[in-house]
């Protein structure tokens, strides 16, 4: 993480996840499915945000997933990759209120497929550590590379804690 105290105009965060989701009989996978597939995944993420001025913040995220997936009850794994790109703009309206717009693209090179999505939301800072938001998501592209399912489109409510 790069989050300077003296000048936090630019913030960066990178992460690596090793997901070993090999549920046995009657156990759920990461998506909560009893009969869903099992997976082994390496996931890399990098996110940046930059304050253009006091009202606008530009954000970007890139994610990469290398996954091995098999149907429940088999050990025949299929390897695939995915690339996630997100571009986001936050607008600080007035004290404690923000609007955000986000565009998303998820590319699956092996399948020669790219999916697109968008998100609009309104957020309210309840205090220094809690933010509540609501909005609408189009296109079904999730920012969670652990998931094996498409994200659902529609309304969402989001509660964020920051420390």
Report residues per predicted region.
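Gram-negative and organellar
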Residues: 1-163
């Amino acid at each position: 993480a790069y989050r300077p105290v003296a000048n936090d105009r630019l913030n960066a965060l990178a992460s690596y996840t090793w997901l070993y989701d090999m549920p046995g009989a009657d156990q759920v996978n990461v998506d909560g499915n009893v009969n869903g597939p099992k997976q082994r995944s390496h996931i890399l993420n990098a996110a940046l945000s930059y304050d253009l001025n006091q009202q606008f913040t530009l954000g970007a995220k890139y994610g990469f997933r290398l996954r091995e997936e098999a149907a429940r009850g088999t050990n025949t794994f299929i390897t695939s990759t995915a690339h996630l790109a997100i571009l986001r703009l936050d607008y600080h309206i007035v004290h404690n209120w923000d609007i955000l717009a986000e565009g998303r693209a998820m590319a699956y090179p092996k399948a020669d497929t790219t999916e697109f999505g968008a998100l609009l939301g309104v957020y309210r800072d309840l205090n220094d550590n809690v933010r509540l938001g609501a909005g609408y998501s189009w296109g079904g592209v999730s920012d969670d590379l652990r998931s094996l399912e498409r994200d659902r489109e529609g309304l969402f409510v989001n509660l964020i804690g920051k420390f």
